[in-house]
């Protein structure tokens, strides 16, 4: 059951009984700015778990257009605001944006923003993937990022938060250091995997 898996991965540790967390420069608060920059397939492959575009007939131009607006307009407005305030972001990026919107990742790279993998497409869910299918999907993202950026992906956030019970193990096995699918705490905490801890 989920409760057993959760207890095995992230044992309960009330925030009131933990040692005080010390941030750099004795800051009282840490703010992590992580915009999701996603790409939704216009006519995505059929999915086992749910239809990415429930409105029929396909293509669902209305819902696709709302999401595509973010990559054409919204992201640039957000970058302007972050630049104005001197804020460096970590981008939760669907790797398909490297192909479809190269200007986006070029803008992120020019600002030395960290790129956190958000899967390939936000309409390519991992729910119901076999272990091998999910391992291959993670490797594909690592390979795309490595080829274009020359670095290893530091973190993982499954597309549409479509993680499986295997995801933490597969992410750690692939050499990724932190994992963002679980919203289970207010502080970064270790998550147990078969390949060492993730944060």
Regions found by a protein language model. Name each.
Residues 2-155, 160-199:
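Catalytic alpha-helical scaffold of carbohydrate-active enzymes acting on polysaccharides/glycoconjugates
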């Amino acid at each position: 059951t989920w409760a057993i898996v959760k207890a095995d991965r992230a044992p309960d540790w009330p925030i009131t009984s933990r040692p005080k967390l010390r941030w750099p420069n004795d800051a009282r608060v840490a703010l992590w700015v992580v915009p999701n920059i996603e790409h939704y397939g216009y006519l995505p492959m059929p999915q086992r778990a749910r239809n990415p575009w429930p409105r029929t007939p396909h293509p669902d131009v209305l819902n696709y257009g709302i999401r595509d607006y973010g990559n054409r307009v919204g992201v640039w407005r957000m970058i302007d605001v972050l630049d104005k305030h001197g804020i460096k972001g970590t981008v939760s990026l669907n790797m398909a944006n490297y192909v479809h919107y190269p200007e986006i990742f070029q803008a992120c790279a020019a600002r030395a923003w960290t790129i956190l993998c958000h899967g390939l497409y936000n309409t390519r869910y991992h729910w119901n993937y076999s272990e091998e299918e999910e391992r291959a999907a993670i490797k594909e993202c690592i390979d795309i990022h490595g080829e274009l950026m020359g670095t290893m992906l530091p973190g993982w956030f499954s597309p549409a938060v479509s993680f499986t019970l295997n995801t933490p193990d597969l992410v750690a096995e692939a050499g990724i250091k932190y994992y963002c699918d679980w919203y289970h705490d207010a502080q970064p905490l270790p998550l147990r995997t078969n390949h060492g801890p993730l944060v």
